[in-house]
Design a protein with these regions (language model features):
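Gly/Ser/Thr-rich phosphate-binding loop
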Residues: 116-172
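AMP-binding/adenylate-forming core of the ANL superfamily
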Residues: 185-213, 223-224, 278
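AMP-binding/adenylate-forming catalytic core of the ANL superfamily
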Residues: 209-297
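AMP-binding/adenylate-forming
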Residues: 33-40, 56-112
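Conserved pre-ATP/AMP-binding loop-to-beta segment of ANL
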Residues: 3-20, 53-56
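Conserved AMP-binding A3 loop
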Residues: 16-43, 50-52
Length: 322
């Protein structure tokens, strides 16, 4: 979808607009969402970051998904001067680009940009950079820490019309815990999954598939949260519950080749964890796992795959990985 096509849809008489989920947990699903709630979401983000009319913004993500659409809506809501570039893994490659007040990228775009000195300099001139659409790896987090500008990780999904919480990745306010926006209530259900009550962007409370931990900020009294992993990424293996994201986080500093953990039905164990990797040295991978992971976290199988399956937005596509 082009920006002109989106704007034509935005300015028509229909109070709703069609969006699609990213497909990280299955086939992308269409959703009809209210334009007024998208404007509410845009206003909340712009207020949080202190964006003002005339500030500059960069659109470098596809308009097929909510993240790209919301960048346009924020520019409309706050009268930002929006520059569009073709979505790519190097969004700041053009040396003629101006400095920006605000931009949103996925982790892969930030990682690739920071690897190129000239592009890194341009990224450092973005006053507020928000990163969403995937996990922040340990390596990327370390690359972000020394940056002088404000860099944030977002939490949200298509159903919440982009993000409902941010956490700072660098500077004195850096944290592992997300701070919800004003007007957003959070709680846990009986399964330990995050429940979001954000009436300005969602008509009903939303029960997520994200297993979370809550705590109260001593300074502000706000309830903060940390995501441990997805409920559907729990492997129930021989009576032991294994959170896939926690296994991957533990292994990431030790494995240089791309990898992911998936699960598969097993007659004896119920389910078993399998490590997929682009490396061909499976013996070495298994040795690292046995030396690094708790005994019951060690995958039961190790398989080579030429290219790990990813969604269009760069998230692991675990469903149907075989």
């Amino acid at each position: 979808m082009t920006k002109d096509e989106f704007l034509a849809e935005w300015h028509n008489d229909n109070p709703r607009i069609l969006v699609h989920t990213s497909g990280s947990t299955g086939k992308p699903k269409p959703l009809m969402v209210e334009k007024r709630r998208m404007l509410n979401s845009a206003r909340i983000t712009c207020d949080f970051l202190g964006l003002k009319p005339g500030d500059t913004a960069l659109l470098c993500m596809p308009l097929d998904y909510i993240a790209g659409k919301m960048m346009v809506v924020r520019s409309l809501q706050r009268d930002l001067r929006l520059t569009s570039v073709r979505p790519s893994s190097h969004p700041l490659a053009d040396e003629t680009l101006p400095s920006f007040t605000f931009a949103a990228m996925v982790p892969m775009q930030v990682y690739n940009t920071l690897k190129v000195p000239q592009e890194r300099e341009r990224l450092m001139r973005i006053r507020h950079l928000i990163i969403g659409g995937g996990a922040i790896s340990d390596e990327l987090a370390q690359m972000i820490k020394p940056l002088p500008n404000a860099v944030w990780s977002t939490y949200g999904m298509t159903e919440t019309l982009s993000h409902i919480a941010l956490r700072r990745l660098n500077g004195p306010d850096a944290s592992l815990w997300y701070t919800p926006f004003d007007g957003v209530g959070i709680s846990l259900n009986a399964d330990g999954c995050l429940v979001i009550d954000a009436p300005e962007v969602c008509a009903e409370p939303l029960v997520t598939n994200d297993i979370a931990q809550l705590r109260t900020d001593d300074r502000t009294g706000k309830t903060l949260f940390r995501i441990k992993g997805r409920k559907d990424n729990v492997v129930c293996s021989g009576g032991i519950k294994i959170q896939i994201e926690e296994v991957e986080e533990t292994l990431r500093p030790h494995l240089s080749e791309p990898f992911m953990i998936v699960k598969k039905q097993d007659e004896m164990l119920g389910e078993k964890a399998i490590l997929l990797t682009e490396s061909t040295d499976l013996t070495h991978i298994e040795e690292i796992c046995r030396n690094t992971l708790p005994k019951y976290w060690v995958p039961r199988e190790f398989l080579h795959i030429d290219h790990l399956p990813l969604t269009e937005t760069g998230k692991p596509k675990r469903s149907g990985a075989f």
